[in-house]
Amino acid sequence: VALIVLDASVLIALLDPVDMLHHAATAALEQHAGDDLKVPASAYSESLVGPAKRGQAQVAKSAIASLLMDVVPITDRIAEDAAELRARHPKLRLPDALVIATGSALSADRILTGDAAWRRLGRTISVL
């Protein structure tokens, strides 16, 4: 069983059937169905913004809950590691740094994202 940390882009794509990454996100989550899925609290929140705007927050929460993943709180260590990542990679946004720092703190086997720019940030990063 692998430990997989999910970026908000994966959940956003999963929840939106017209998102260009929807099919890739669906396939990736099916592939990792037996793995230990984690999502940082920041990415969980980010993934609910669009559904909340459309009045579908509860539907989105239920869909995410069906994936049986754990929402990981942002600890001091994760926040500090994210700050270090941002210092080294100025173009990296804080929400993205928090996902990568969470993966590092949990010793994740894989960090799954839809953002191709993350490839340069580590071996454990997989892009949809």
Region locations from a protein language model:
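Short, hinge-like loop/turn segments at secondary-structure boundaries
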Residues: 54-58, 90, 127-128
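Histidine- and aromatic-rich ligand-binding microenvironments
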Residues: 6-7, 39-41, 92-93, 115, ...
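Active-site neighborhoods of divalent-metal-dependent phosphate/nucleic-acid chemistry enzymes
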Residues: 71-114
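Internal alpha/beta domain cores that form substrate/cofactor-binding pockets in large enzymes
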Residues: 61-64, 70-74, 119-128
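Amphipathic alpha-helical segments within well-ordered protein domains
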Residues: 45-48, 83
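Short, well-structured N-terminal submotif of metal-dependent ribonuclease cores
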Residues: 1-38, 51-62, 116, 120
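Acidic, PIN/NYN-like endoribonuclease modules and their adjacent C-terminal/linker elements
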Residues: 1-3, 46, 100-128
